[in-house]
Amino acid sequence: MIKQSEEEKDLLDVEFFVLGQAVNYLEHAHVVVRRLSEHHFKSENHKNIFLLIRDILRDRDTISISLIWEEIKRRNLDKSMDVSYLIHMSQNADIPIDLDHHIDFLHEKHVNNLLKEFLDSSFQDFTRYPNRRSPYTLIDQFKERLDDIYEKTSYPRRKHIGKTVYDIFSSGENGKASVIAQIRHRYDYRSRHKIDYVDGLPTGYSSIDEHSIILSRGNFVVIAARPAMGKTAFAIDIALNLVLEQGKAVGFISLEMSPNQIVERIISNLSETSCEQLKRGNFSRDVLSKIESIGTKLKGTHFFICDNKSTDLNTLIDQARELRENQGIDALFIDYLQLIGSSKKAENRQNEIAEISRQLRKLAVELQIPVVCLSQLSRKVEDRGDKRPMLSDLRDSGQIEQDADVILFLHRKDYYSQEATKGLSEIIVGKNRHGSVFSTTLRFNSCTGKFTIQKEAW
């Protein structure tokens, strides 16, 4: 028989006393179940007793030795423990203990065990593949695992939970200005400039911006559509509006096109010359002069395109952080979500996309800039009579719908119907966490990828 260490004996004693309190006192049982899980117990018998107490409390608001013992027998657990063990546990609960302190002890032991496992496996990963992985990729993977440990082991603490509404109203939170200070600043701005204060970046399309500012700091924005609707063109158009009209810095990461192809799209947009003409050299000398002058227009602007040879999520996140830190980008565009690969093993592609979506949302919040990601829609759109997209059409994962702050759909009637008015694109804001949902119409030149304000009726 293996002799127990003093440390292990102390741990089992604490488990024993904590469960004894839960067996004897209903209010203590609720505290134990709320703040611990079966993973906090080393002894298998203690794990089972905890789970039994939890299940009993879900069905009724009472606890007793007899109820626990009935459940033990019903689940055929009486071979590994006797009713005398429960009685002994209950009798020892009369000894006064600091329940909060003992719960904290179990929690810290559990976290220490997870950290030890993490450090051991991380060391093995590091030594198994020396110099074969980017150190930054490893750092991101380690950070991801630590974040997982933190999320899994966070639990309701007994003190200092939350801040009062008045505290946030008057003094803010996490280093931010107070709510009243922010509201006062917006009022002063409106009074001084006689125009509305904009808490974010404009898209450059008044029919969108007058309804809602979708490019707010920390927003995860998804532009979704079926192929040929103009997703990439719309993203480039918004990026150009930010760079040329607002003087902002923008990052563009494309997993689908090379930097040269993106720049050709930009030239087509600004010169109003079709991409096909540019490819064939089929344009006049005047058009060539116009194209050459675009270089002067773009000189000194801050439109950064990443030459992304990897589709790995961690690499993409590294690039985004570097663009924010070194180039000071005000917005990031990613084309497109379904081409991103995750380093985490997932049961299926749907779960992988869900993880990518969660990480992109976290990235937007971390960098405090709008992260605009393009996304495909499923073929279900084609099965409907009007072909009009909706949230359930988001491809591969409903998690995108949950994570995104704003979801915009692009819909072109003329793509599906010869009778529809040519050159119109409906922009549908299907989700807007901080504003209203609406739709508007823009003119779209599919040859140049240029979107413009639509004055006439849809």
UniProtKB/Swiss-Prot annotation:
Top-level division of the source organism's lineage: Bacteria
Swiss-Prot/TrEMBL catalytic activity: Couples ATP hydrolysis with the unwinding of duplex DNA at the replication fork by translocating in the 5'-3' direction. This creates two antiparallel DNA single strands (ssDNA). The leading ssDNA polymer is the template for DNA polymerase III holoenzyme which synthesizes a continuous strand; ATP + H2O = ADP + phosphate + H(+)
Signal peptide: none
Gene Ontology molecular function terms on file: ATP binding; ATP hydrolysis activity; DNA binding; DNA helicase activity
Protein's UniProt keywords contain Membrane: no
Keyword terms: ATP-binding, DNA replication, DNA-binding, Helicase, Hydrolase, Isomerase, Nucleotide-binding, Plasmid, Primosome
Gene Ontology biological-process annotations: DNA replication, synthesis of primer
Residue stretches making up the SF4 helicase domain: 194-458
PROSITE patterns given in the database record: SF4_HELICASE (PS51199)
Enzyme Commission code: 5.6.2.3
Annotated ATP binding sites: 225-232
GO annotation, cellular component aspect: cytosol; primosome complex
PANTHER family: REPLICATIVE DNA HELICASE, REPLICATIVE DNA HELICASE DNAB
Name of the protein described by the UniProt record: Probable plasmid replicative DNA helicase
